[in-house]
Amino acid sequence: MPAARPRLAIIWLTVFIDLVGFGIVIPILPFYSARFGAHGMGYGALIGAFSLMQFFSTALLGRLSDRVGRRPILLATMVLNAAGYLLFAFAPSFLLLLVARLIAGFAGGNISAAQAYVADITSASERSKGMGVIGMAFGLGFIFGPGIGSIAARLGGHAAPGLVAAGLSVVNLLSAFFILPESLRAEHRAVRDLWPFGHMADALAHRELRPLMLVWLITPFAFSAYTVALPLWATTTLHWHEQELGIFFVVVGLVAAFVQGGLFRLLTRVVSDRRLLITGMMGMALSIGVVPFLAHSATLYAWTVVLAFSNSIMSPAATGLVSTFAAANEQGTVLGVAQSLGALGRFTGPFVIGVVYDWTSPLAAFLVAGGAMLVGWAASLGVPKPRRPDVSLSV
């Protein structure tokens, strides 16, 4: 791992700048959609469009990165990000705003190439620690991004956040172009078809990968459902406003940055990735299911820390295990399949939980989300202990 640290730092910076741009735009989406007369359904369409496009692109871009290398994919998606944010800034209609989110969603599929990059430069025993670096970039991006977006909108008007995000994407492109080397050696490149969904079926049929793929589908489904139900419930029950919701997301980001930025590496010295995965899944199930029984903001914030901690140990452990069970020339493909399933969960979760919340009760919504996490926890129990660094999917 010491030899990989300079390149880990570079890929960390790449993902961090990417996520800051993402974080800049997300908090202002409701207001942007309202400018064009679109409210609940329109806002949901903007969120869903991103996740739906990411569902298709993560597997495709991961597969393509196994063929042409990680660097070209990362650079190309940075160009797409800049274009998407520029369109977002100047979109004259809701339709073009939706197109901007579709572009951003496709570019967001580059996470599979970024994770494959980490897998290329780390050993199997160090892989989950390297994935934790990616997680820390996510956490810090969500901390800094919304604040930058709010300041930009206040000082420069409605187009400013998109312009700032586009500028960051250009900075990211230039820095990566000059300092990010290719990580995939020529002998590990795979020349296969680029249609990714047959490989999704292969991954689900693979004995060692199947439970991990279920975890990757269920966890984003439950977590995204939780993030939809929580603001609705907290505003009516605890009388939360924008400030309290802002604190909630900052808490999640701070805990993620702290855990995945250092604590996770310490934990992996004494606890296996499999055990961290199982523990994290149970912690998330409990912290989601308990919410409707809480009566005070302080207890909700406390359980938010539990939720964020559990997610922060579960996510890099799950990513590391997926990478460990994949062959060297299939890292992008398999990680792309996992990320595609995650995007599918993020796409379906808000819709399902919204229907449950409206048609039944807030209690039912949280119990459905928590129950889904329990199913994911049960799936995690089926993850075998890694015996060897690489297991081919034979795809």
Name these PLM-found stretches.
Residues 55-92:
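Conserved MFS/SLC helix-loop-helix module at the cytosolic interface between two early adjacent transmembrane helices
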Residues 27-41, 229-244:
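Short amphipathic helix-loop junctions that connect adjacent transmembrane helices
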Residues 23, 51-59, 109, 142-143, ...:
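Residue-level signature of mid-helix packing/kink "hotspots" within the transmembrane helices
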Residues 100-139:
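Cytoplasmic helix-loop-helix junction between adjacent transmembrane helices
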Residues 274-318:
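C-terminal transmembrane helical hairpin of 12-TM major facilitator-type secondary transporters
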Residues 58-69, 259-273, 357:
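Helix-to-loop junctions at the C-terminal end of transmembrane segments
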